[in-house]
Amino acid sequence: DANGTPAIAADGRIRFDALTFWTDSGSLPPPDEDAGEVAGRDGRVVARGGAGQRTPGFVTGSPQEANGLGGRTIYYDRTSSSLGRLNVDVTTAAALQSDFGAATAAESAELIAFSRGLDVDDLDGDGERNEPRGWLFGDALHSRPLPLNYGSIGGYSDPANPAIFIAVGSDDGMLRMIRNTRAGGSDSGEEIWAFMPRASMGAQKVLRANGTGMQHPYTMDGAPVAFMYDKNQDGSIISGDGDRVFLYAGMRRGGKAYYALDVTNPENPRLMWTIEKGGDFSELGLTFSTPRVGLIDTATGPRPVVMFAGGYDVNKDKRGVIGSDDSEGNAMYVVDAETGALIWKARGGSGGGGGNVFEHAQLVDSIPSTLSVADTDGDGFTDRMVVGDTGGNIWRADIHGRDVSNWKLTLLASVGRHAGGAPSFETDRRFFHRPDLVPSKDGNGLFDAVVLGSGNRADPLDKGGSAYNFMYMIKDRRTSVGSGVDTGLQHVDFGDVTSNCLQSNGGCIVNLVHGWRLGLEEPGEKVLATALTLTGKTFFTTYLPFSGTGATACSPSEGAGRLYAVSL
């Protein structure tokens, strides 16, 4: 930890007496010793230290009602391509009244103040409202912190202390930019700015009410990704050199939108574009799919692009029923990284190829997964995307060449409810996570191993009547440009290695020409993460839900996890 002492306890969690690096130990509140808290330490208690404690105006002063007053700097999307200041003023309150769901402009102003972190309801009863609430950093439930290394800029001259900023989304409605260390080398963790899109403002009333029994609100819950371009490759991001840093983020269950910000200057963001459901993106569902960035070849040279799947349809939230076709989310997109303009998409339908839209009749299930992308011929351009959907189908999109009308979508395999026979709970397999794509070969030649596991992430605790889930390895032998012809492969076409017969001495024979499948035999066991293949071995984890409650009657059951290692 910050004091050089062991930070991790025997149970795998942070020790109560640990001090994290950004935390100011002298500014911590008195500990709750009954809960295990330690004086001068934040330890495993989230709402004591870290970046949350470093939020401007939290420890001293105030978050303030407006940017530029020594408190927080918060922006919102004034238009789809410009930022406004989220200030407590008459004009802003009136403009955002409907976005906040406020009955009056006065309530809208209160919700802006609440969003900025002010104690508008005097929760501590001291009569002061221009002070911080008890905690100002929402949960980063599914988002992941993204470190961005800007090198030697703005006073950061020591190579051992580059200018690193961290972007992360959270369910209080914000995408934050956090400073790692100061130019002099001391720890920071300070929030430089935050971005609250209009799409997440409606949740502020729920957060403010904080009522018993209210459902947890989701807002900016997606993991951000970045496109970084260091033109002269000097290790520093300097706008005058032609360098660029673009940041992209979705909302997962928080909404149906993607946002792109130019953060070439990490302290002065610019909104580049917004993609929302409608128009070219009429198929867009909840933006579960973390964007991928890459380059494609065009007549005018390399072109940066953003790639993502159509997202999640809440139709698949229904419990106790077999999955059915979705009305949104059944698509894949490639867009211009700088403008957000659609370059190509695949969607459900019977039209086939032509223009910048490819339709496939069997693309009827939403795709919450992040895409696996690849450069199959090593020319520096992304030319393939692979993904599974919530109907148990695995897809490959070939985006090779400059003519997008030749790009195509192929059904690699169908291992869920569509795979022959009447759909059943047992075959209602769903894919939520990015496949692991591994160039490989066997006695029949080269193939791309597509490794992915099934499991309904939207209902992780389900164990009764749930699908019999599997980990699959599919041998895709179209290692260069795909044919566009569906393989026809189904669940039964992959060798069943569940019994471990490949390691037995009994002469068990399994046909692995198309790949293999490994059954997850515990009730409700499911894959909830992407596999990793190293040196010919695939590692993956599973989740096992437990019945009953946790340590107390009101606490949840954590369940258990398993780690598997399987020879590819």
Predicted feature descriptions by range:
Residues D1-L568:
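Beta-propeller fold recognition
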